[in-house]
UniProtKB/Swiss-Prot annotation:
NCBIfam families: L9. This is Large ribosomal subunit protein bL9. SUPFAM superfamilies: L9 N-domain-like (SSF55658), Ribosomal protein L9 C-domain (SSF55653). The lineage of its organism: Bacteria, Pseudomonadati, Pseudomonadota, Gammaproteobacteria, Enterobacterales. Pfam families: Ribosomal_L9_C (PF03948), Ribosomal_L9_N (PF01281). Belongs to the bacterial ribosomal protein bL9 family. GO terms for biological process: translation. The keyword RNA-binding applies. InterPro entries: Ribosomal_bL9, Ribosomal_bL9/RNase_H1_N, Ribosomal_bL9_bac/chp, Ribosomal_bL9_C, Ribosomal_bL9_C_sf, Ribosomal_bL9_N, Ribosomal_bL9_N_sf. It comes from the Bacteria. The keyword RNA-binding applies. One of its GO terms (molecular function) is rRNA binding. Binds to the 23S rRNA. Keywords: Ribonucleoprotein, Ribosomal protein, RNA-binding, rRNA-binding.
Length: 150
């Protein structure tokens, strides 16, 4: 199925590109999320009229994402208390939701889907580097310190 992308989509393309995708991916994900429209003659003409407006909107969201990333980088360190054993092993684990909640409590809104844990959930006390994907091209890094609860 041919679609016109209205936003940058990872591993697919950027704004305005006409790409071939499977019908289910287009119907169930791209179109409902507002990331694409079917590539009919009418939609192609409509898109060409609105191209500048959509590019400006995309640049605006990118700038907002970079501002959020700068705030997260400024924050630098987030401390999360958790129950742990004697050797520094946690009872349970710290996942994306816990990290997102801690960053939100520090004053910057972050959803759990934006948190990237390269080595899976955190199971030990100490310092851990975590990256936050604020936008498809904008990343921020953060140091998460897990301390044992008293």
């Amino acid at each position: 199925m041919q679609v016109i992308l209205l936003d940058k989509v990872a591993n697919l393309g950027g704004l305005g590109e006409q790409v071939n995708v499977k019908a289910g991916y287009a119907r169930n994900y791209l179109v409902p999320q507002g990331k694409a429209v079917p590539a009919t003659k009418k939609n192609v003409e409509y898109f060409e009229e609105r191209r500048a407006e959509l590019e400006a909107k995309l640049a605006e969201t990118q700038a907002a994402a970079e501002a959020r990333a700068a705030k997260i980088n400024e924050l630098g360190i987030v401390t999360i208390p958790s129950k742990a054993g004697d050797e520094g092993k946690l009872f349970g684990s710290i996942g994306t939701r816990d990290i997102a909640d801690a960053i939100t409590a520090a004053g910057i809104n972050v959803s759990k889907s934006e948190v990237r844990l390269p080595n899976g959930v955190l199971r030990t006390t100490g310092d851990h580097d975590v990256s936050i994907q604020v936008h498809s091209e904008v990343f921020a890094s953060l140091n998460v310190v897990i301390v044992p609860e008293a």
